[in-house]
């Protein structure tokens, strides 16, 4: 009888251990995929790279003038600058608040970012999905606008839906449908069509990791505006990760730096050398 009890105890013990191991493996396999992108921005576009609760992302985004300015203007470095400063703070692991300011049209914006779905290692969820609604106000002076703009007329809105998949340790691809609206437009606003208020596009972007700290990146934002002969936005760059910093250097055909203006921007033609140099500096802080 004692031998039987001992045998049953051993069987139960090993069965329990095996079951626990299977549970641990199941949890491990179903964990979220990490580092789909190196930063919350890939060149100009928001990505599905979400902040953890208590994490702060600070970025400086900068584009210069077109390289067609030649050596006299240091291939655009001396002219046509657009600068954007932005902060994003993770309230939870799935929700963050965003604010920023762009020198183009002196737009101050406020928004949120929700992580709706997360790609899992097991494949039970094949993609990551976020949604980013933004509202901005043109704070330009009356001298710049030439005529009075009410507060409501100065507002612009956008919503983007980044959908991304990390196909391997090296390759990540993303599509971002974007809808944008400007309450009032005119020749004084830095967009391609001074008579059109609403815009819809679908931006494509991706990254390919070359080494542990570098990756190649790209974006393509087609122009669906048939009223003006506006080329699509095209950009290529390189990302360099150094601890808590991610440096991004790129060439782009657009001067715009955030979603509503990216959807409506006046773009150059890459093959005609109508592109410009730009860079982003991304810094992550844990402040909780």
PLM region descriptions:
Residues 4-13:
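Sec-dependent N-terminal signal peptides
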Residues 175-222:
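A mid-sequence, solvent-exposed acidic-amphipathic segment
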Residues 1:
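Regulatory/sensor and coupling segments of signal-transduction and defense proteins
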Residues 14-20:
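Sec/Tat signal peptide C-region and signal peptidase I cleavage site
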Residues 21-148, 155-159, 164-183, 199, ...:
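Transmembrane beta-barrel domains of Gram-negative outer membranes and organellar outer membranes
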Residues 4-5, 82, 202:
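Short hydrophobic "helix-edge" motifs at membrane interfaces and signal-peptide entry regions
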Residues 146-151, 190-193:
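Flexible, glycine/proline-enriched loop segments at strand-loop-helix junctions
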Residues 210-217, 226-228, 245-248:
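Substrate-binding/catalytic groove segments of enzymes
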């Amino acid at each position: 009888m004692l031998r039987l009890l001992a045998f049953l105890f051993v069987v139960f013990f090993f069965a329990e251990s095996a079951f626990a191991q299977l549970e641990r493996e199941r949890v491990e396999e179903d964990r979220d995929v990490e580092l789909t992108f190196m930063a919350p921005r890939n060149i100009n576009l928001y990505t599905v790279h979400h902040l953890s609760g208590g994490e702060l992302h600070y970025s400086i985004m900068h584009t210069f003038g077109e390289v067609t300015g030649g050596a006299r203007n240091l291939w655009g470095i001396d002219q046509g600058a657009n600068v954007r400063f932005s902060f994003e703070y993770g309230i939870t692991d799935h929700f963050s608040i965003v604010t920023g300011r762009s020198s183009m049209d002196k737009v101050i914006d406020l928004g949120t970012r929700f992580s709706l779905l997360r790609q899992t290692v097991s494949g039970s969820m094949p993609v990551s999905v976020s949604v980013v609604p933004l509202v901005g106000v043109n704070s330009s002076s009356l001298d710049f606008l030439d005529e009075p703009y009410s507060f409501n007329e100065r507002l612009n809105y956008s919503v983007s839906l980044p959908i991304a998949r990390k196909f391997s340790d090296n390759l990540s691809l993303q599509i971002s449908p974007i809808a944008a609206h400007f309450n009032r437009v005119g020749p004084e606003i830095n967009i391609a069509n001074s008579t059109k208020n609403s815009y819809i596009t679908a931006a494509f972007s991706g990254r390919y990791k070359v080494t542990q700290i570098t990756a190649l990146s790209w974006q393509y934002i087609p122009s669906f505006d048939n009223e003006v002969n506006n080329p699509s936005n095209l950009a290529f760059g390189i990302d360099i990760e150094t601890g808590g910093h991610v440096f991004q250097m790129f060439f782009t055909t657009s001067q715009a730096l955030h979603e509503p203006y990216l959807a409506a921007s006046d773009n150059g033609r890459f093959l005609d050398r109508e592109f410009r140099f730009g860079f982003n500096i991304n810094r992550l802080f844990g402040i909780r």
